[in-house]
């Protein structure tokens, strides 16, 4: 199991080079030679869309999206079966969010990963998830296939979350307003 954190800057040691950040889990958990570790670091950088030339830079020299790619590369270093991604795109611009989400989905398929994707943005959750668990007050209150959660939620809190999603279509606005008022 590995982790991808919400804030890529605070989760990366600012005094370490990118290559050392990605290599650290390999130093701790593998018996690879130095050459093999360096080759794997370069391979991981390539997998997340960064170049091996960037390995000798520090985290502050990268954008938020690039730093998140470094965090993703670090999480893949030990070839985990499961990655816990805690709000991995919430601190990023919308255009960068899409790139990171698509990268994670590609890596999930390529490496046969299970990703526990923790998020508040239901549009992101719907896009990336096969199954969704809904938490309320620290308790898992509903878990189901993504389509079932969105089409036929069973828990009241899940229903309330789905009703809170902004709807760009103004034609149904009055109906949704009546529905919200009938709950209260």
Q: Whereabouts are the PLM-identified features?
A:
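A short, proline-enriched helix->beta-strand linker immediately N-terminal to the Walker B motif
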Residues: 77-81
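Conserved ABC ATPase "signature" region
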Residues: 35-53, 162-163
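Conserved ABC ATPase signature
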Residues: 58-62, 66
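A short, surface-exposed alpha-helical micro-motif characterized by mixed small hydrophobic
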Residues: 125-127
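Hydrophobic anchor residue at the start of the ABC signature
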Residues: 72, 100
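Short catalytic/signature loops enriched in Gly
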Residues: 145-184
